[in-house]
């Protein structure tokens, strides 16, 4: 219902789906969060491929690529493509020149425990420069939506309260 509830209990009492922890935004809906869950092990690869198309062919092609690769809403796709542009602007060296794209450099290949997981320089750069705006505008990223992805982030960073009511 795009309402921010202070606690999961408050949302549960009102019998509404909890699609993400934190503020709501363009991706805070059951369709986009459902896509995050359905593509938990493939969305990074799809988005990276579309990010590469952004690099070579621009925003319009990246948007088309995301539409063809996912079932996200147009508003959420716009968020992802805007984030790709941010990453290109701020993290080109870390992600492209070092070829440390998420599909080439697994973040946690040894399955380390939460306290020993560290982000690749590409992911760390994106976290520092692009993630805050994504969260402000888009609401649900995969961690906020309770999705354990192929990136291998600490489990403690993944929202445990997501509960989508059919």
PLM features: residue spans?
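General marker for long, soluble alpha-helical cores
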Residues: 1-166
């Amino acid at each position: 219902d795009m309402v921010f509830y202070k606690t999961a209990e408050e949302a549960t009492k009102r019998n509404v789906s909890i699609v993400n922890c934190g503020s709501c935004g363009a991706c805070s809906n059951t369709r986009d969060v459902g896509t995050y869950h359905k593509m938990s092990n493939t969305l990074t690869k799809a988005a990276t491929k579309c990010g590469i198309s952004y690099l070579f062919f621009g925003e319009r092609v990246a948007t088309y690529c995301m539409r063809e690769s996912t079932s996200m809403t147009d508003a959420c796709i716009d968020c992802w493509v805007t984030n790709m542009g941010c990453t290109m602007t701020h993290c080109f060296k870390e992600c492209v020149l070092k070829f440390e794209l998420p599909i080439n450099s697994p973040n946690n290949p040894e399955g380390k425990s939460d306290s020993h997981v560290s982000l690749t320089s590409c992911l760390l750069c994106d976290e520092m420069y692009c993630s805050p705006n994504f969260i402000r505008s888009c609401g649900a990223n995969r961690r906020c939506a309770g999705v354990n992805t192929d990136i291998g982030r600490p489990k403690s960073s993944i929202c445990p309260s997501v509960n989508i009511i059919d």
